[in-house]
Amino acid sequence: MRRASRDYGKYLRSSEEMGSGPGVPHEGPLHPAPSAPAPAPPPAASRSMFLALLGLGLGQVVCSIALFLYFRAQMDPNRISEDSTHCFYRILRLHENADLQDSTLESEDTLPDSCRRMKQAFQGAVQKELQHIVGPQRFSGAPAMMEGSWLDVAQRGKPEAQPFAHLTINAASIPSGSHKVTLSSWYHDRGWAKISNMTLSNGKLRVNQDGFYYLYANICFRHHETSGSVPTDYLQLMVYVVKTSIKIPSSHNLMKGGSTKNWSGNSEFHFYSINVGGFFKLRAGEEISIQVSNPSLLDPDQDATYFGAFKVQDID
């Protein structure tokens, strides 16, 4: 009995020594060290994500409206008025011409009340869709990015358009007479005329970006005997490409061309064409205009009298 007691005591001491060894793991509750908070995404990634979600929201809203109009037209084509179609067209034109400052273009003030309400409803639908996609907490900071035009955020995600312009003469506003005048009425969106990232204001083409530009002008003069006799026997038919600076009021002739013609003969028809072009360094805010002599003899066709510019490269 005593021997058994001693053996049991040795067993207990041996168990205690083995349990206190460094190799035995702790059996109590484990408390892992708190992990460091995840770093916040960089602003650029957050902005890119928001722009992507914005594009998704815009696409979903536009598709929904298109499907609504389609099925509505299928059910009753007479229910969709031409006013609704014109409103969509005018709203799109308003934002397409946002970079132009000519008073003849579409502007917020020229929209009728019905179109303005449609624009506001569309804007509200886009904002609601974005809030549904990104959540109310993340959307709370979005209005700061959506200040100004309701399509500004979408435009910011696009690369800036290369500046160019091709302008054709407005035949209804050609001055009369034989004296030298500045042509102040050009088309920018009719026929072959087009403009992008440049401004047409009071007949002058304004540069919005510094750079090297290629400028060109083609002016045609013509006269038919049915139009009566020419003012004089000898005509000086000239064209001038003029640069004007707004910051420092001054004007300089960049190019000119022309000739003196005798149109007093027995010919039934007279025609003369002038074409000039060249590279020039232009600064933002400078304006290009066209001056001609004998404006009453101008050929009003879009393939005869026009001028334009396009950016070739940046200024180093």
Curated annotation (Swiss-Prot):
Membrane-spanning parts: 49-69
Residue stretches making up the THD domain: 163-312
PTM entry text: N-glycosylated.
InterPro entries listed in its UniProt record: TNF_dom, TNF_ligand_10/11, Tumour_necrosis_fac-like_dom
Sorted UniProt keywords: Cell membrane, Cytokine, Cytoplasm, Developmental protein, Differentiation, Glycoprotein, Membrane, Receptor, Secreted, Signal-anchor, Transmembrane, Transmembrane helix
Residue spans, topological domain Extracellular: 70-316
Residues carrying covalently attached carbohydrate according to the record: 197, 262
Extent of Basic and acidic residues compositional bias: 1-16
Pro residues bias spans: 31-42
Keyword Plastid: no
Induction annotation: Induced by calcium in pre-osteoblasts and osteoblasts.
Site positions for Cleavage: 138-139
GO molecular function: cytokine activity; identical protein binding; receptor ligand activity; tumor necrosis factor receptor binding; tumor necrosis factor receptor superfamily binding
Pfam families, alphabetized: TNF
Tissue specificity of this protein: Highly expressed in thymus and lymph nodes, but not in non-lymphoid tissues and is abundantly expressed in T-cells but not in B-cells. A high level expression is also seen in the trabecular bone and lung.
Domain of life: Eukaryota
Residue segments, region Disordered: 1-42
GO cellular component: cytoplasm; extracellular space; plasma membrane
Cytoplasmic-side segments: 1-48
GO biological process terms, semicolon-separated: animal organ morphogenesis; bone development; bone resorption; calcium ion homeostasis; calcium-mediated signaling; cellular response to leukemia inhibitory factor; immune response; JNK cascade
Function as written in the Swiss-Prot or TrEMBL entry: Cytokine that binds to TNFRSF11B/OPG and to TNFRSF11A/RANK. Osteoclast differentiation and activation factor. Augments the ability of dendritic cells to stimulate naive T-cell proliferation. May be an important regulator of interactions between T-cells and dendritic cells and may play a role in the regulation of the T-cell-dependent immune response. May also play an important role in enhanced bone-resorption in humoral hypercalcemia of malignancy.
PANTHER family xrefs: TUMOR NECROSIS FACTOR FAMILY MEMBER (PTHR11471), TUMOR NECROSIS FACTOR LIGAND SUPERFAMILY MEMBER 11 (PTHR11471:SF3)
Implicated disorder: Deficiency in Tnfsf11 results in failure to form lobulo-alveolar mammary structures during pregnancy, resulting in death of newborns. Trance-deficient mice show severe osteopetrosis, with no osteoclasts, marrow spaces, or tooth eruption, and exhibit profound growth retardation at several skeletal sites, including the limbs, skull, and vertebrae and have marked chondrodysplasia, with thick, irregular growth plates and a relative increase in hypertrophic chondrocytes.
Family per similarity comment: Belongs to the tumor necrosis factor family.
Subunit structure: Homotrimer. Interacts with TNFRSF11A and TNFRSF11B. Interacts with FBN1 (via N-terminal domain) in a Ca(+2)-dependent manner. Interacts with TNFAIP6 (via both Link and CUB domains).
Annotated protein name in UniProt: Tumor necrosis factor ligand superfamily member 11
Gene it is expressed from: Tnfsf11
